[in-house]
């Protein structure tokens, strides 16, 4: 098996790269940081925790609206998803080798240029209100929510959406929190696997990943 290269970038991010011919002409990436929603803290709006990933899905990235970005990703055969879990934040994606420059640019923009999108937000607020109004009448959703609560030991942080939590959700505050979680490259490990030569990958890492903003401190998760 081929060796794994470990690169420590100037901004404190760590890159683990393994060349692999398992999937021809493709690169996969996972960026993982510690902390996640556990950093919301007891003083801030706890209801935001249930909607962080909805906020991510309905925000613009690098000037692309959510629908424009979906279209671009589809056209270029790129996958790209970001999320915030209870104890981590992550970005994962894959791209064909001929789209690597665009892919790394989109990864960079996902960290640095995420903004609210008014049209997407208003559609989301309308649809979510309808969904949550109907939720209590769905035996399947009630069952799913019950399982989630049990899994989280009835914690207040169990990601169960309801009209009550939605009424307390603050969109701007949640978006600011998401951006804060992705504002410290020093906190991230990038795991990259693909059918690509190191000579081709390294300049992209140096141009995009190494220039991500950093606070030069490592985060951890808060025990809730």
Where are these regions (language model features)?
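N- or domain-start disorder-to-order transition segments that initiate the globular core
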Residues: 2-24
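A common structural junction motif
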Residues: 108-118, 208-216
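Extended non-catalytic domains of envelope/secretory-pathway proteins
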Residues: 5-9, 169, 195, 199
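An aromatic/glycine/proline-enriched structural segment found at the starts
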Residues: 154, 184, 189-224
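M16 family metallopeptidases and their MPP-like homologs
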Residues: 16, 23-57, 61-113, 124-133, ...
């Amino acid at each position: 098996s081929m060796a794994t290269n470990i690169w420590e970038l100037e901004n404190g991010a760590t890159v683990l790269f393994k060349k692999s011919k398992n999937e021809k002409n493709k690169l996969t990436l996972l960026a993982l940081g510690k902390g996640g929603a556990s950093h919301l803290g007891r003083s801030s709006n706890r209801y935001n925790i249930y909607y962080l990933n909805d906020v991510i899905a309905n925000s613009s990235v690098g000037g692309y609206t959510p629908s424009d970005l979906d279209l671009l990703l589809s056209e270029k055969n790129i996958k790209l998803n970001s999320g915030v879990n209870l104890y981590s934040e992550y970005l994962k994606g894959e791209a064909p080798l001929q789209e690597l420059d665009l892919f790394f640019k989109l990864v960079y923009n996902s960290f640095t240029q995420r903004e609210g999108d008014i049209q997407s937000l208003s559609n989301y607020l309308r649809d979510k209100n309808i969904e949550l109004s109907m939720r209590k009448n769905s035996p399947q959703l009630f069952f799913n929510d019950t399982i989630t609560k049990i899994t989280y030991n009835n914690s207040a942080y169990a990601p169960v959406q309801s009209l009550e939590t939605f009424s307390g959700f603050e969109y701007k505050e949640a978006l600011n929190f998401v951006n804060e979680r992705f504002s410290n490259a020093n906190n991230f490990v990038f795991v990259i696997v693909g059918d690509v030569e190191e000579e081709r990958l390294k300049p992209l890492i140096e141009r995009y990943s190494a220039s991500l903003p950093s606070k030069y401190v490592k985060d951890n998760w808060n025990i809730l």
